[in-house]
Swiss-Prot record:
The protein, known as: Photosystem I reaction center subunit III
Chief location bin: plastid
Domain of life, per lineage: Eukaryota
GO aspect biological process, one term: photosynthesis
Taxonomy of the source species: Eukaryota, Viridiplantae, Streptophyta, Embryophyta, Tracheophyta
Organism, scientific name: Cucumis sativus
Residues in coiled coil: none
Gene3D superfamilies per the UniProt record, alphabetical: Photosystem I PsaF, reaction centre subunit III
Encoding gene per record: PSAF
């Protein structure tokens, strides 16, 4: 589980980045 390896702070940033990538792909 990635969320378990990274701090909550980084996890949120990662989620944001993932959403942005998803928008770019769509």
């Amino acid at each position: 589980d990635i969320s378990g390896l990274t701090p909550c702070k980084e996890s949120k940033q990662f989620x944001k980045r993932e959403k942005q990538q998803x928008k770019x792909l769509e």
